[in-house]
Amino acid sequence: MATDGASCEPDLSRAPEDAAGATAEAAKKEFDVDTLSKSELRMLLSVMEGELEARDLVIEALRARRKEVFIQERYGRFNLNDPFLALQRDYEAGAGDKEKKPVCTNPLSILEAVMAHCRKMQERMSAQLAAAESRQKKLEMEKLQLQALEQEHKKLAARLEEERGKNKQVVLMLVKECKQLSGKVIEEAQKLEDVMAKLEEEKKKTNELEEELSAEKRRSTEMEAQMEKQLSEFDTEREQLRAKLNREEAHTTDLKEEIDKMKKMIEQLKRGSDSKPSLSLPRKTKDRRLVSISVGTEGTVTRSVACQTDLVTESADHVKKLPLTTPVKPSTGSPLASANAKGSVCTSAAMARPGIDRQASHGDLIGVSVPAFPPSSANRIEENGPSTGSTPDPTSSTPPLPSNAAPPTAQTPGITPQNSQAPPMHSLHSPCANASLHPGLNPRIQAARFRFQGNANDPDQNGNTTQSPPSRDVSPTSRDNLVAKQLARNTVTQALSRFTGPQAGAPPRPGAPPTADVGTHPSVGRTSVKTHGVARVDRGNPPPIPPKKPGLSQTPSPPHPQLKVLIDSSRASNTGAKGDNKTVASPPSSLPQGNRVINEENLSKSSSPQLPPKPSIDLTVAPAGCAVSALATSQVGAWPAATPGLNQPACSDSSLVIPTTIAFCSSINPVSASSCRPGASDSLLVTASGWSPSLTPLLMSGGPAPLAGRPTLLQQAAAQGNVTLLSMLLNEEGLDINYSCEDGHSALYSAAKNGHTDCVRLLLSAEAQVNAADKNGFTPLCAAAAQGHFECVELLVAYDAHINHAADGGQTPLYLACKNGNKECIKLLLEAGADRSVKTTDGWTSVHAAVDTGNVDSLKLLMYHRVPAHGNSFSEEESESGVFDLDGEEESPEGKSKPVVTADLINHANREGWTAAHIAASKGFKNCLEILCRHGGLETERRDKCNRTAHDVATDDCKHLLENLNALKIPLRILVDEVEPSNYGSDDFECENTICALNIRKQTSWDDFSKAVSQALTNHFQAISSDGWWSLEDVTCNNTTDSNIGLSARSIRSITLGNVPWSVGQSFAQSPWDFMMKNKAEHITVLLSGPQEGCLSSVTYASMIPLQMMQNYLRLVEQYHNVIFHGPEGSLQDYIVHQLALCLKHRQMAAGFSCEIVRAEVDASFSKKQLLDLFISSACLIPVKQSPVKKKIIIILENLEKSSLSELLRDFLAPLENRSTESPCTFQKGNGMSECYYFHENCFLMGTIAKACLQGSDLLVQQHFRWVQLRWDGEPMQGLLQRFLRRKVVNKFRGQVPPPCDPVCKIVDWALSVWRQLNSCLARLGTPEALLGPKYFLSCPVVPGHAQVTVKWMSKLWNGVITPRVQEAILSRASVKRQPGFGQTTAKRHPSQGQQAVVKAALSILLNKAVLHGCPLPRAELAQHTADFKGGSFPLSIVSSYNSCSKKKGESGSWRKVNTSPRRKSGRFSLPTWNKPDLSTEGIKNKTLSQLNCNRNASLSKQKSLENDVSLTLNLDQSLFLGSDDEADLVKELQSMCSSKSESDISKIADSRDDLRTFDSSGNNPVFLATINNLRMPVSQKEVCPLSSHQTTECSNSKSKTELDVSRVKSFLPVPRSKVTQCSQNTKSSSSNTRQIEINNSKEENWNFHKNEHLEKPNK
């Protein structure tokens, strides 16, 4: 059965219809077993075996099934007793191995045989039937086709007849119309000529008016600028004079007051000297004074420790409140401080009034309260006379003794004051501290005289500067304070009454120490305050008046008993006193009275604002052999460390600012010294020197504020920083070092609060309680951290102070340090392990505190500072390995290290629900908010108790920051999609331009997004098409939707967000922010409508040709069918034509027509026969017999300038103009047969010509085409390069427009000006074939920060493109009119020497006038690139006039040179190859480069390019022998170019410093000579370097007559404007030739000037 089935396969293949059968048969024929390989045969065999097995299985299954059915049908009627059924059953049940024959014949085999036979027959019949049907169908189809063709033939024949009839009528009508139109054309042509003539006249008038207007506008602008400058100068001068007048008036008023006071004081002195009673010394008076006595056993040396700069004191407030009182200049004639200096501070007040100190130190921890002392008429500094002497340098270590100082010997009380002198003992921060007495003057007279000396600013006749009188406050704010003035006057009166003391031998006056007891101690230390004389230096900014201090009376208090101290002087005593941050000086006294009563007049702070003085400490070295007590050096540790950047006062509420600063001089006789005043031995300080056995007696008596005991004194010493006293007190037994006052302040607390590190160290080493808290819970560490004393903090931390101690309000030291804003303290506390998360009772954390003060450094430390792994020290390795550095904040700290604080701490809310972000936003601390926002866990939507977010309470700046927190910055770019790549000048066009970056916020809606996209596109189009470098913000005020180039949001074809298309106005379910995040859109791409849509928007954007002009070009092509685009080479003609053809093609295809573009490049070998074949093959030119085709054909002929237009197109002009069968043209085909052809209406012809203008026979073609001229000085070419380069710059700056002062803008403007100036010069030279279109400049590189790249590119463009074109154009013009033997070709191959000279001169002129001029590179940098430009080394130092008189070779009258460089010998400028010594002088024509007297030598020597080719100069005789009139005309044109006012002068190239943009015609280094009328050019004279002397001589007309006669024809010498004025005057008055040249050349130069002005406008 298998074989039967296999054999049936061919029969089954005939079952399908004929086509399928034929395919199967063909496949069978192709199948050849012989060609199969061995592996393929095996595969086939295995397949066939599998098929056979499958068939056998199927057959067996079918056989069994058929058997059962057959038996059932045949024997089903028998029952069980049927013998046949029993036999069958028994047979089948037999278990024999061999197959047994059936009982009867098997009906299945019969049935299968019948079925196989029937199947075969059926397949054969079906195959035959299918073949018959297919043949029948073919026959029917052929019949139908034949009938259709016959019917169509009949219809076409009828239609042909109808069309012939219609065409005849149309042709007759057209003939009549043509006759009528020809008449009208003639009339219109006549009218057109008239109108054109009128138009030209109007244009001329308009041009003249425009020139006048531009000149007038420029003049008015310059005048306006000058007026503005003068006005600003006048305003400044007026303000200065007004201020000076005010100062002088005030000074005059002060001087008048001084005069009145002086008169009164003199009278008082006279009266006082006569009536003053003798002095007595009561033991105890109300006016007790401090006496310092010293014995001058040997000369004391004053060691000056000076600081003449402002010391940063403990309180920043004091800096504002205290006047600066440092003398301006040392004065030998004035004392350091006069009597009763206003504002002086009682040096002993700190010891005398402990109650004040204690009360003042109990203020708030962070509060500011500076103690003020009430004025007292009884407390004052009393001087017996001034002390004058030498004034050494204050910075010198050992000031010399005065020259007239007597040796320190014991003096008797009777010595007169005139003979009494002593060496200076103590001085403090004053250049005139060490002063000796003038021996010839009475000390009282000196006191009065110095008291009424002038202001410290007024130097006397000796050059010294005197101090202002201390009796009045000269600060500007107190001049109007009558109370302060009256108080000062009273004080002066009282003080001067003390000056009238008795002479030697007179009884002492009461209240003064007796001189008899201290006569052997001539040197007395005194303490005084520097006067306010220097405060008058600046009257303009008075210091602010300090507020009244709480707790201090403003009324005078009763006088207090003073401390009298007699200390051993063997050790240096510190005499500096700080009284309210004033350092009190102690100059010596050399009066016979000897004893200086030290008392201070305390004035109210409210009436005398003061500034801190410049502190300096002079330590007096006492004689050797004397023991110095510990107290003598008590001020060593009194000055706190100056902490930079403190925001809180270091000593806000304590009186430590008035430490005891007393001059101590020991007495040789202690008993005598102590017996001077009873009770002196009871003094604390006297006892400290070793004379008293106990410190317990009362220190004071009669004062209102006595000391309360040792613990109070301990606190006072700690608060004032008195290390010596503190160490003495700590050495006592039984003293409670941890005693706390009523406010709970311990000594350690006071020292830490005021920043006295030495005191803190002493107290801690004495085991003071480091964590002792006051009544508010503040520990010393809290106090030090709050005040910013990081050294104290470091000490306290080292002594295991509780770092996280919380005060009653929950404030920790870290919280207080953050509140103060001292980053050193914060860093120390963090490294010590301070907890950032501790909260106050109000819920504030240290982060809240740092943000509340707006301190960025503190917040950064809190967020990023990591604690070192080991110890408190900060190792270098750790700092380098990720510890946040405040100085490195620019390097994005979050990139280096992640924030240390947790999100919970950042988002922690205080009691009112405010987070740190709320505080920063509400206070406008944008920097702090920005740092908080860097933390990834910040929740900006957290709401406070009033349901407000940080955004709700933020200021405008912070709102903007929060809105842009999660904003996406996605660049928006414009994609210029070209259909097919082309070589039509589009290589330089950028296909992708990024115009801006859109900020997409979370709350941005799709409407806002659409508006933003549209606005960004509109702004971009307006920015790139504007005339100047306007930013995108500047153009937003312009409400016009269309830009100058015609592009707007309507020009968009499609927008894609990432890869998803989107259109303006479309909305998605997600917000724009979510959409961008989900789709991971990295950019938004805008596609503009292009030629494929029948639009030209993308072409406009790519080429920067305005859309309106492109649409006009397209309209011309559609309307006239024959259009030729012509312009200078590189004017993008090919690109424009190709894009127009694409747009036209897609428009026709959209209208249902098929369209084809045929392009042909024309060269010199392109023949008319090739053009005919092109027209015929493209079906543009069809035979007359053939019906017109419906297909649109666009033919582009490129480079038509390479062939003759008249020869190439002559035979096609008529049929192109009249496209119909009525005006056919007969053309001969290649086989010799002629046939009539015509152009049909569906053919468009466009051509391109790279020529500026047509010439000769080509003009015959002009009237048969529509011409589009692409002029370089007119749109679209004029502004194309500017717009293109601006768009390139915007793309380079990622959508931003740089400011005009940016170097990129300057270099781009320079490239633009090079193109314009180059074409302007070439047009003037009459070489239009050398003009360049903007295409060559489109590749200008824009590299920010690398302007030299553009200069290198320009040199390559100059060498590769410009120079060959100019050379060819010059040679072709110079050889046009030569005789045939010297034709153009010959001239180009072998140019004459004259032609070579003209070419070199022209190249040099062009290079300097058009290219190098205006280059923004600095001169030195430009000089490095100048050598890269070819043709710039032509020196052009030759001049010849145009008269024909011959001259001897040596004469150089007509070859006048203008050279600003040093004169060189003429031999250096000769070129051997051009030199012919034997040439006769008769052959030299003076019609040569007469005024080519350029100073190229000088300019190029400065540009380092002449040194390589110094000898490139033509010799006088051979140099410029011009063989034709054209060469002479060229030379004239070159001269006029160099002398033209309208052209840019290269003389400024070497003159300008770094900006070569401005130019002048003055000619410091001119390449060619400028005419004398350039004197009229409005150019700044400051920009021109002065000339050498020989140029000045040549400028004037005072030359020899011979020289003037020779050069009388024309003078193009440049006259520099920067030189003396007589040059111009002489020239204008006497040079008639110059005036004539000016008149003759005015029209041409004005025209050029206007053109230049027109070109320069876009750059402004």
From Swiss-Prot:
Question: Has the keyword Nucleotide-binding been applied to this entry?
Answer: no
GO CC aspect terms: actin cytoskeleton; cell cortex; dendritic spine; FAR/SIN/STRIPAK complex
In this UniProt entry, the residues modified to Asymmetric dimethylarginine are: 498
Q: Which residues carry this modification: Phosphoserine?
A: 1524
Q: Where is the composition biased (Basic and acidic residues)?
A: 1641-1660
- Report the SMART domains cross-referenced here: ANK (SM00248)
* GO terms of molecular function: protein phosphatase 2A binding
Superkingdom field = Eukaryota
- Biased-composition ranges for Low complexity? 386-396
As recorded in UniProt, coiled-coil segments are 119-276
Give the chief site where it resides.
Answer: cytoplasm
Q: Where is the composition biased (Acidic residues)?
A: 875-892
Spell out the subcellular localization from the entry. Answer: Cytoplasm, Cell cortex; Cell projection, Dendritic spine
Keyword Cytoplasm, does the record have it? yes
Residue ranges for the region (Disordered) are 1-26, 203-222, 366-440, 454-478, 499-596, 872-897, 1445-1477, 1617-1660
In terms of Pfam families, this protein maps to: AAA_lid_NAV1 (PF25408), Ank_2 (PF12796), CortBP2 (PF09727)
Ranges of Polar residues composition bias in the record? 411-422, 583-593, 1619-1640
ANK repeat copies, ranges: 709-739, 743-772, 776-805, 809-838, 842-871, 912-942
Which PANTHER family does this chain map to? Answer: CTTNBP2 N-TERMINAL-LIKE PROTEIN, FILAMIN/GPBP-INTERACTING PROTEIN
State the oligomer form and interacting partners: Interacts with CTTN/cortactin SH3 domain. Interacts with STRN, STRN4/zinedin and MOB4/phocein; this interactions mediate the association with the STRIPAK core complex and may regulate dendritic spine distribution of the STRIPAK complex in hippocampal neurons. Activation of glutamate receptors weakens the interaction with STRN and STRN4.
Write down what this protein is called: Cortactin-binding protein 2
Identify the species of origin. Ateles geoffroyi
